[in-house]
Amino acid sequence: MSDASRVAVVTGATSGIGKATVQALRGKGLTVYAVGRNEEALSELATTCGAKTIRADVRDTAAIVAVLNGVEVDILVNNAGILSTRAVFQDIDPAEIDAMIDVNLKAPMHLTRALLPGMVARRRGHLIFIGSIGGQSAFPNSSAYGASKAGLSLFCDNLRLDLLGSSVRVSEIVPGRVETSLYRTSIPDNQASAVLYDGYRSLQPENIARVIENVIDLPVFVDVARVEVYPTDQASGGGTMVKFQA
């Protein structure tokens, strides 16, 4: 299929990896539906790159699917995710546990379930999931987040088994440290930059969008099951990162 005939849906589209992915795919000529809650940011995407927008909480599958009624979706980028708190597990508010499981695991499962039958019937489609090294390795103060991302990773593995022979591809992109707003909600007093980014060469959202572009452009019989992406200053597994020495 030509890029102009392909249709993509990107969740968490108003910032970070999601926004960069929308811009990259629109730059290739795809029709892109950007899903997010921030009306102003969605309007900006519509104006600057011509994305179609769906203002909805990613947990509201019905609202998203209603807009996509009759649309033949070729690519679903399940990007939306939250790290709402960083604390030892015994101190986490139970509501925070529910939120991370709902957004990071249940929402992509439900949206995938809604769009997948059409892909299977058409014998084409690509499901992209933005995972996390936090779902591959243990990190302190990340029990609920890590569990949600580990569950997502195993879901991808099982989904591939369910889809064998269907020509529908499943790819999990597992980034290392990316400079996005994810941590800014969980690190207090606007300390995220000082703690995580100052002096480090972190990945940028555009780097991950480039990986997604490369994965979807491979021949349709080639399925990149999982790819881990790190800055050169971060060790595999993500637990060790050094500051850049010029």
Tell me what each language-model feature is.
Residues 14-15:
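Conserved glycine-rich cofactor-binding loop
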Residues 87-89, 93-101:
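Substrate-binding pocket helix/loop in short-chain dehydrogenase/reductase
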Residues 90, 139-143, 200:
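Active-site loop immediately N-terminal to the catalytic Tyr-X3-Lys motif
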Residues 112, 148:
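Active-site helix of classical SDR
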Residues 117, 161-162:
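Alpha-helical segment proximal to the catalytic Tyr-Lys
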Residues 132:
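Residue(s) in the substrate-gating loop at a strand-loop-helix junction
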Residues 172-173, 191-238:
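C-terminal helical subdomain
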